[in-house]
């Protein structure tokens, strides 16, 4: 019997006959417990185009991108001992941007996808609940989405399809890098770095978040 790579590496994927599920990796375990109305644990990546976004073409591009990222087609469920991601046949739908940035995506007991693609004028937004993926995964997804969009929007341009340097399996995409690379051994002589600059002032509640856009001449900077 031929054994797949996922089986060889002991990936925690179970086919129940109705759905597929997988445990959250170690770095994501805390997010479902601390998320709420004022702390959504959602982050945003966006791409600013030189042209206005066509919503219908963006939807077609998202459908294509989702075929390459089946692990994103999942809802967050709570089991007896842990949270887990369960595959669901829910179509990801593109929406015009109407909600405040990084609005709540995970609501307990609500079976909805953990990311949202929206657009406003020339901008394509990708917002995702942090338990689903990290910044690297989000960046790759958005890159793929924008590439698919531009190819569909400009078929006459014959734009190249940029492939990954090497094949990435579903197992690679769901690898628990925290367990693989984290070490509690911290060198005693580790060089101390300067603290990051912290913004001062009164912090707004999440519902008051908004996008501020400013256009100015480079010569004035």
Where on the chain are the PLM-derived regions?
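Short, Lys/Arg-enriched N-terminal segments with co-localized hydrophobic residues
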Residues: 1-13
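Non-catalytic N-terminal regions of enzymes
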Residues: 10-179, 208-211, 215, 221
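Flexible, P/S/T/G-rich "lid" or insertion loops adjacent to the active sites of thioester-utilizing
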Residues: 177-221
């Amino acid at each position: 019997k031929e054994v797949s790579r996922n089986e060889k590496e002991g990936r925690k994927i179970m086919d129940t006959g109705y759905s597929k599920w997988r445990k959250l990796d170690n770095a994501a375990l805390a997010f479902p417990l601390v998320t709420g109305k004022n702390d959504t644990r959602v982050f945003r990546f966006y791409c600013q185009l030189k042209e206005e976004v066509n919503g219908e073409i963006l939807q077609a591009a998202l459908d294509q991108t989702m075929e390459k990222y089946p692990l994103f087609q999942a809802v967050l469920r709570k089991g007896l001992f842990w949270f887990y991601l369960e595959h669901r046949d829910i179509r990801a739908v593109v929406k015009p941007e109407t909600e405040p940035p990084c609005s709540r995506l995970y609501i307990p007991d609500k079976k909805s996808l953990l990311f949202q693609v929206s657009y406003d004028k020339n901008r394509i937004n990708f917002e995702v609940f942090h338990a689903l993926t990290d910044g690297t995964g989000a960046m790759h997804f958005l890159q793929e989405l924008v590439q698919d969009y531009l190819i569909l929007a400009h078929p006459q341009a014959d734009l190249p399809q940029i492939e990954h340097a090497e094949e990435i399996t579903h197992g690679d995409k769901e690898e628990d890098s925290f367990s693989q690379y984290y070490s509690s051994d911290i060198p005693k002589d580790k060089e101390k770095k300067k603290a990051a600059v912290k913004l001062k002032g009164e912090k707004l509640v999440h519902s008051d978040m908004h996008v501020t856009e400013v256009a100015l001449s480079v010569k004035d900077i």
